[in-house]
Amino acid sequence: MSAASTKLAGDTPVATGAFLFLLLFFTSCATQKDVQHRVVISVKDQKLALLDRETPVAIYPVSTSKYGVGDWQGSYRTPLGELEIAQKIGDGMPPGTVFKDRRRTGEIVGVNAPGRDPIVTRIIWLRGLEWQNVNAFRRDIYIHGTPEERNIGLPVSYGCVRMRSADLIQLYDVVGRGARVTIVDQPLVAVVYGLPNAAQAALTIRSGMTIH
């Protein structure tokens, strides 16, 4: 078949160029990373800070691993270092929506339901960007909701970062795919510029308030 016989009507250099431009434009939009927001998680403090253009705007209590920090397979530890948001799962789902293997089960679990500890409400799936957290995505390291909200602020997870459902929904609705997530084993005030003093920060964290 000749090249002429496969040429589409209107397939001029101008038309082809316009098509490629639009294709690249929409592909770029679909894959554009969130560079405005950053999340910093302190294992030491069991706290998470949300930054907007590097300015802290909210802090929340969290729960990291009961086994400490690390990233090897089967360790059930929370990885340290620079990561990014790879996927977001659970748009619009009611608080307490149960997920298994990142799929909704159809069940909704209440806060502090006795004997229940599934992943609930939303899933923010993290991908490691460094050697020290290269296994994070394969290990299914998430920021996710938990029914056991009474334990938030204590290290009781199996590697993930747990949040209260209401706090998680706030965070989920702000950050986009590609946003950086930094996990450190230091106090937040040591790594985030512009945080309030320790006493004010403690009040802010307990109440779940923003800190504009």
Task: Mark where each language-model region is.
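N-terminal secretory signal peptides that target proteins for export/translocation
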Residues: M1-D11
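Well-ordered beta-strand positions in beta-sheet-rich domains
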Residues: R38, I59-P61, E82, D140, ...
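Sec-dependent N-terminal signal peptides
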Residues: D11-L20
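Exported/periplasmic cell-wall-interacting domains
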Residues: D34, W72-R77, M93-H212
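Post-signal peptide N-terminal segment of mature Sec-exported envelope proteins
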Residues: Q36-A58
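C-terminal motif of bacterial Sec signal peptides marking the signal peptidase cleavage site
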Residues: T27-S28
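Structural motif
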Residues: D45-K47, E82, I123
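Electropositive
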Residues: V57, P61-M93
